Amino acid sequence: MFYANMKEFELIKLVERLFGDEDVITPAGKHDAAYVKIGNRLIVLTCDTVNEKSDFPPYMLPEEMGWMAIAVTLSDVAACGARPLYFLSSISLKSIEFFEDILLGIKRCADRFGVKVVGGDIDFSEITTIAGFAIGEARRHITRRGAKVGEGVFITDLPGKAQLCLEMLERGAKREELPYAEKLYTPVPRIEEGMRIARYASAMTDVSDSLAVSLHQISQSSNVKIVLDNIVLSHLSPAENALELFLYGGGDFELVYTAKSSDDGIRIGRVERGKGVFAEIDGKTFEVEFRGYSHF
């Protein structure tokens, strides 16, 4: 993971221009996943890719690679408040030595959330790469668009933990020294929380690219201003860059959402008239940049 300019999001905008007018409820690029109507069922479709060069941290076991591949894909389903049903994967390896371990990781995560693994593909590659495709079913249509003035901004858990652990590894820390190793190696998609939140939230997305990126996406899609007025950094202590981690760190698979009230998350801000994302700390207000994790 690394902080970078928003080239990846520029590529997504290209996808929107080419495919964003398809005759579906929520087309490509508009949300974490696509919504399509099949009969009377509201179906959610999404895919994600992870590889050893840009996604797998040091000391990651093959079984954890499999877990991560399905977990990050299911996180997009969670951001729709949907129940995941089926999963397929395309696995590219330079050696079949750890193939079974990767499958076991996929199975562990799938079994935890009642997901059926129904197929996939195997290929050769110089770097281990796993692409996942998930199908889910939602009860209602919720996206990044819909936040309303006067609502609160909530998150299922405080962000920055995965990035903190990654930066500790990059400075020479051992895996057993990490305070939140599970956030980095076996992230848990917020499936149950997402289904509950979707019943009442006005907008929702996951924060895998960073809290800042996700809030900007909600702000732009909903045409509102978001102000963070309850920034908690104690969980990132004693990191000197705790605020940077909180706002711009990637790799957390929490859900951020807007609602009048909520018992499913931590309130971190409010929705106002206007545009952009801002933060209030010690009586001072500053603008939050559109910045976070990018593959490019």
Swiss-Prot record:
CDD domains to which the protein is assigned, alphabetical: ThiL (cd02194)
Q: Name one GO biological process term.
A: thiamine biosynthetic process
User: Which residues are recorded as binding Mg(2+) 3?
Assistant: 32, 76, 206
Q: What is its EC number?
A: 2.7.4.16
Which top-level group of life is the source organism from? Archaea
Residues involved in Mg(2+) 1 binding: 48, 121
Residue sites binding Mg(2+) 5 per the record? 209
A GO term, aspect molecular function: ATP binding
Reactions that this protein is recorded to catalyse: thiamine phosphate + ATP = thiamine diphosphate + ADP
Q: Where does substrate bind?
A: 55, 293
Ion transport as a keyword? no
Ligand binding (ATP): 120-121, 144, 208
Positions binding Mg(2+) 2 in this chain are 48, 76
Q: What class of enzyme is it?
A: transferase
Which parts of the sequence bind Mg(2+) 4? Answer: 32, 46, 76
Q: Does the record carry Magnesium as a key word?
A: yes
Instruction: Write the record's keywords in alphabetical order, separated by commas.
Output: ATP-binding, Kinase, Magnesium, Metal-binding, Nucleotide-binding, Thiamine biosynthesis, Transferase
This protein's pathway reads: Cofactor biosynthesis; thiamine diphosphate biosynthesis; thiamine diphosphate from thiamine phosphate: step 1/1
Family statement: Belongs to the thiamine-monophosphate kinase family.
More details? Reaction mechanism of ThiL seems to utilize a direct, inline transfer of the gamma-phosphate of ATP to TMP rather than a phosphorylated enzyme intermediate.
Role, per record: Catalyzes the ATP-dependent phosphorylation of thiamine-monophosphate (TMP) to form thiamine-pyrophosphate (TPP), the active form of vitamin B1.
Instruction: Write the protein's name.
Output: Thiamine-monophosphate kinase
Q: Which organism is it from?
A: Archaeoglobus fulgidus (strain ATCC 49558 / DSM 4304 / JCM 9628 / NBRC 100126 / VC-16)
Traced from the root, the source organism's taxonomic lineage reads: Archaea, Methanobacteriati, Methanobacteriota, Archaeoglobi, Archaeoglobales
